[in-house]
Amino acid sequence: MEKREVNKALYDLQRSAMVYSSNDTPPRWSTTMDADTRPTDSDADAIIDDVSREKSMREDHKSFDDVIPVKKIIYWKGVNPVTVINEYCQITRRDWSFRIESVGPSNSPTFYACVDIDGRVFDKADGKSKRDAKNNAAKLAVDKLLSYVIIRF
């Protein structure tokens, strides 16, 4: 199992209150349940199951009800959208990546990119270079993410 998969599973378990993490770097994980009420293997499999992840991706990203300080949102106004995604995922402890594909002839391809945050895939954007496609996809993802966050004053 890769580190990325383990992190996703741990943060999924944390959201469901089965484990908690320390503020150390890297975090230390502990269970929140007594020995007699520990979840079974089938409970953990249901959380990690890829099918449930696919279903959650179709929920229009409304599960991102994160609380972000207003200072961060003001700062993000003039920052590159890729930087915003990176900082957002650091604050919320989420994994993220780009999915990039190339279409067309090798001498003038069109690149398509989309942002994947914790298994939730955002809208696809195109560009003449990978960098342009990433920036365009990040802009779309930031617009959608910031429409669902809760601002803390």
UniProtKB/Swiss-Prot annotation:
Molecular functions per Gene Ontology: double-stranded RNA adenosine deaminase activity; protein serine/threonine kinase inhibitor activity; RNA binding
Region spans: Disordered: 22-44
InterPro entries xref list: dsRBD_dom, E3L, WH-like_DNA-bd_sf, WH_DNA-bd_sf, Z_dom
The Z-binding domain, residue ranges: 1-33
Record note on quaternary structure: Interacts with host G1P2/ISG15. Interacts with host EIF2AK2/PKR. Interacts with host ZBP1.
Function of the molecule: RNA-binding protein that plays a role in the inhibition of multiple cellular antiviral responses activated by double-stranded RNA (dsRNA), such as inhibition of PKR activation, necroptosis, and IFN-mediated antiviral activities. Recognizes and binds Z-RNA structures via its Z-binding domain and dsRNA via its DRBM domain: RNA-binding activity is required to escape host ZBP1-dependent necroptosis. Mechanistically, the Z-binding domain binds Z-RNAs that are produced during vaccinia virus infection, thereby competing with Z-RNA detection by host ZBP1, suppressing ZBP1-dependent necroptosis.
CDD domains named in the record: DSRM_EIF2AK2-like (cd19875)
BP term (GO), one: symbiont-mediated suppression of host ISG15-protein conjugation
The protein, known as: RNA-binding protein OPG065
Pfam family, one: dsrm
Free-text note regarding domains: The Z-binding domain recognizes and binds Z-RNA structures.
Source organism superkingdom: Viruses
